Every structure is written in structure tokens, then in C-alpha cells.
Design a protein with these regions (language model features):
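N-terminal ligand-binding/catalytic initiation module
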Residues: 1-113, 120-122, 129-132
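Residues that form or flank phosphate/diphosphate-binding pockets in enzymes
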Residues: 116, 147
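Glycine-rich Rossmann-fold phosphate-binding loop(s) that bind the pyrophosphate
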Residues: 141
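Hydrophobic/small residue at the entry helix of a nucleotide-binding pocket
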Residues: 144
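Conserved small/polar residues in nucleotide/adenosyl-binding loops
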Residues: 153-162
């Protein structure tokens, strides 16, 4: 009997997958696997839709020994703000590595990508920052600046200057 496909919204994912030390450790483990295992990761597929200033990127990878893999679909339509819509969104499809059956749809609207990027910054800081560093400078004021700040606080205490 086939199990039903799990559908998680951005709200669900924000509740279930916070930007915390476990997320930072997970991303570090993923980088380690990419560097040390025979990870299958094809080039990014990019579909341009020039008449609407749009593009869609599709990314995936498979790590041997992990029961599932995901396919990320990431559209960017850069005139959308003039329509009152976000310029980017996205979703991921989680499949069984054994059967190829769809297990879950993650309707994250880019949240998981934002989380991964912030956690990757924390991994870099963990390995490249001086151990006695007491502050971090973050240039920018958007979503990534805020998320980088949160991710760093999980590594060590930093002062915040606005």
C-alpha cells in the first residue's frame, strides 16, 4: 500500500525546521558529505522565460545511504513586485531514493533556501572566524542579513549594532 504524500506549507516548515544549531550542524554534515562521498549532483537546470523577466532553476542531489532525496524548483519572476507578488518562491519534492515515489511536497516559498544559506554562513564562521571573535559584521539589511545574524548567535554570543 502506498503511503499518502505529505504536504507541508511554509508555515508548517517554519514551525518544524527552525534556524538553530541543529540546522547549522545538518548543513555542515551536508558539506562534509559533498566533499567526501560520491554525491550525485547534476548541473542546475535553468529555464529562462525572457518575455516575463522570469527564470526557473531546478536543483537536486543524491547522497548514497540517505533514504530520500529532493528536487528543488525555484522560480524567479522579477517583474512580480509590480503585480503585488514576490519575485521569488519555490518548492521541493521529496522522493524515496529506493522507489522514486513522491513522499512529500514542501511548499516553502524559499524559506528552506534562506535557512540553508544562513546556516552555511554559520558553518563558514565556525571554521574561519577567530575563536576569540566577539562580534560579527553583517553588511546588508534584507532577509539574509537577519537570518545570518540569527545563525551566528547559535555559534557564540555576538553584539548587535544597528
Amino acid at each position: 500500500m502506498r503511503t499518502p504524500v505529505i504536504i507541508l506549507t511554509e508555515t508548517d516548515l517554519r514551525r518544524l525546521v527552525p534556524l538553530d544549531l541543529a540546522a547549522v550542524d545538518c548543513i555542515e554534515d551536508a558539506f562534509r558529505a559533498l566533499a567526501t562521498q560520491a554525491v550525485a549532483m547534476p548541473p542546475v537546470l535553468r529555464l529562462d522565460i525572457p518575455e516575463h523577466r522570469g527564470e526557473v532553476d531546478v536543483k537536486t542531489a543524491y547522497v548514497p545511504g540517505i533514504d530520500h532525496f529532493a528536487i528543488k524548483i525555484s522560480p524567479g519572476f522579477f517583474d512580480n513586485p509590480t503585480l503585488g507578488l514576490p519575485s521569488t518562491n519555490g518548492m521541493m519534492v521529496v522522493l524515496s531514493a529506493r522507489t522514486g515515489l513522491v513522499q512529500a511536497l514542501l511548499l516553502d516559498n524559499g524559506y528552506l533556501t534562506d535557512l540553508r544559506t544562513a546556516a552555511a554562513g554559520a558553518v563558514a564562521a565556525r571554521h574561519l572566524a577567530r575563536q576569540d571573535a566577539e562580534s560579527a559584521a553583517i553588511l546588508g539589511a534584507g532577509m539574509q542579513a537577519r537570518m545570518q545574524s540569527v545563525s551566528y548567535t547559535h555559534l557564540r554570543a555576538h553584539e548587535t549594532r544597528g
